[in-house]
């Protein structure tokens, strides 16, 4: 499986096997490879295809022999791989942990307050058999609220560029991959509506490199050269200059109408792209990634605790910088349409006539573990009902389902979504079916058989998710984030909650969706 790359071992053991195989390969064994494999043979078999119009396209058997003979005639010279050099040394004045607070949730984690004001949430994980042994998220409480209000759309474009290119010491992100010092370190930066984050994970033995990378990205950032930015701008402007896709244009209008022309959701236009320059790239980076007074670092690792503490003091507690920017009080985007709203558009077909239907229910629901579990029941049962009616009985689509979108932020509404494609002539009938099925669920609730089937599926899926989380520090760290920031409860007695879900709970959630706002999007090509 080493040669074919179909591992029969867990990743760590596979890596050990590969290293042992590679360590046994020397230049002396490689030097004789061509002769051993291709020349010391009584017969050479070749299968090739020569097109009629180009009969010499593939070499003949004699030509192949001549090529191999020329290789044997010349002594092979060793050409070892060479790597670029990276100055990875940093001079820092370490800080310290000034306060520790223990929390019993998630099996136990700690909150550390550092001497520079940064908060760290650290969780010591059980050993995992995976490549990632350190997962970190460096989260700044900035996001879109930190951008200049008069250049917001341009700033969002600049942020997208920053997130792709951000590196350090004259190297963009892509170039950093060439350095052996950073092998085994994964880097991701992102700027979202509510926060900006640097996400770093590392293999065993690369934990200090990960922390050092975080320090360099935040203290010695490199955003690339102007030529790279201008090429990206030119490529995007070229795409804007092409004939707009009718479906994309409709989606932009739909978003604008549903969310009340929220400034964070404006599409990139030529004016916004043209307004981006190197100065704005730098300003957007500083607004997103230098507010150290509001930096929170989440760490989950199965490595030595003392080492993690030392790296935190050296590379996190030493972060310094002023933050002169003000943040806006812009509210998060929420659907502003009330009641039942129908948004439609019809255009000429690109191929076959089709209607794309997205039926969205919007309702305020309290985000608790129990409510999320109730939504799992509703998703499973409604999906089965929609599939049975719209696909099996009506023959109206290949796939249809219902899914509840639960936001991390509990101040945002829940959304229940049914989306599918159908033939234009069936649109009105099937849109009516979507509402009728929800009305029936809100009136009578699910049957005992439906509850039993849903419960079995949900219990099985939960077990699969727990097994995956137990082997993934990235997933465990994500749970730490959601526990601390949004109050999610992953310690609840899942089986007890599952047994406590009744048909009336599912019916009541359906009633909330039915009583909420309905936004129906229909895009037709015929």
Can you describe what each PLM-predicted range is?
Residues 4-148, 283, 291-364, 372, ...:
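Proteolytic maturation boundary segments
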Residues 379, 387-388:
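Long, His/Glu/Asp-enriched segments that create or flank divalent metal/ion-associated functional microenvironments
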Residues 382:
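PLD/PLD-like phosphodiesterase catalytic module centered on the HKD motif
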């Amino acid at each position: 499986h080493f040669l074919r790359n179909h591992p029969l071992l867990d990743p760590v053991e596979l890596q050990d096997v590969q290293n042992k195989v590679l360590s046994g390969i020397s230049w002396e064994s490689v030097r004789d490879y061509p002769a051993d494999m291709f020349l010391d043979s009584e017969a050479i078999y070749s299968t090739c295809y020569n097109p009629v119009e180009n009969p010499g396209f593939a070499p003949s058997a004699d030509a192949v022999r001549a090529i191999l003979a020329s290789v044997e005639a010349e002594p092979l010279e060793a050409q070892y791989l060479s790597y670029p050099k990276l100055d990875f040394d940093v001079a820092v004045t370490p800080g310290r942990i000034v306060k520790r607070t223990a929390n019993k949730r998630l099996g136990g984690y700690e909150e550390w307050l550092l001497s520079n004001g940064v908060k760290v949430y650290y969780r010591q994980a059980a050993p995992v058999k995976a490549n990632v042994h350190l997962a970190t998220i460096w989260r700044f409480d900035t996001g879109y609220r930190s951008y200049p209000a008069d250049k917001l759309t341009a700033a969002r474009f600049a942020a997208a560029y920053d997130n792709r290119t951000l590196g350090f010491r004259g190297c963009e992100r892509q170039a950093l991959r060439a350095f052996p010092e950073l092998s085994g370190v994964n880097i991701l930066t992102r700027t979202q509506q509510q926060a900006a984050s640097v996400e770093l994970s590392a293999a065993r033995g690369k934990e200090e490199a990960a922390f050092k990378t975080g320090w360099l990205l935040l203290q010695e950032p490199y955003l690339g050269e102007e030529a790279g930015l201008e090429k990206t701008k030119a490529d995007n402007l070229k795409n804007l200059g092409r004939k707009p896709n009718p479906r994309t244009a409709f989606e932009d209008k739909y978003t604008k109408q549903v969310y009340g022309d929220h400034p964070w959701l404006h599409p990139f236009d030529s004016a916004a792209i043209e307004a981006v320059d190197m100065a704005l790239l730098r300003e957007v980076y500083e607004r997103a990634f230098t507010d150290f007074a509001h930096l929170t670092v989440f760490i989950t690792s199965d490595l030595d605790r003392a080492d993690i503490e030392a790296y935190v003091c050296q590379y996190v507690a030493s972060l310094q910088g002023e933050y002169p920017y003000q943040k806006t009080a812009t509210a998060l985007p929420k659907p502003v349409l009330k009641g039942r709203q129908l948004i439609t558009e019809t255009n000429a077909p690109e191929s076959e006539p089709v209607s794309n239907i997205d039926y969205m229910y919007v309702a305020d629901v309290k985000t608790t573990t129990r409510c999320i579990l109730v939504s799992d029941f509703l998703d499973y049962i409604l999906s089965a009902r929609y599939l049975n009616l719209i696909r099996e009985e009506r023959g109206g689509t290949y796939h249809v389902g219902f899914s509840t979108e639960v936001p991390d932020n509990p101040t945002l509404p829940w959304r229940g979504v049914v989306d599918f494609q159908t033939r234009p002539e069936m649109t009105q009938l099937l849109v009516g079916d979507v509402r009728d099925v929800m009305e029936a669920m809100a009136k009578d609730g699910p049957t005992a058989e439906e509850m039993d089937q849903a419960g079995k599926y949900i219990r099985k899926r939960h077990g699969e998710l727990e097994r995956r989380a137990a082997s993934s520090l990235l997933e465990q760290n994500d749970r730490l984030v959601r526990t601390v920031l949004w109050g999610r409860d992953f310690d609840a007695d899942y089986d007890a909650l599952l047994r406590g879900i009744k048909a009336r709970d599912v019916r009541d959630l359906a009633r909330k969706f039915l009583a909420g706002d309905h936004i129906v999007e229909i895009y037709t090509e015929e």
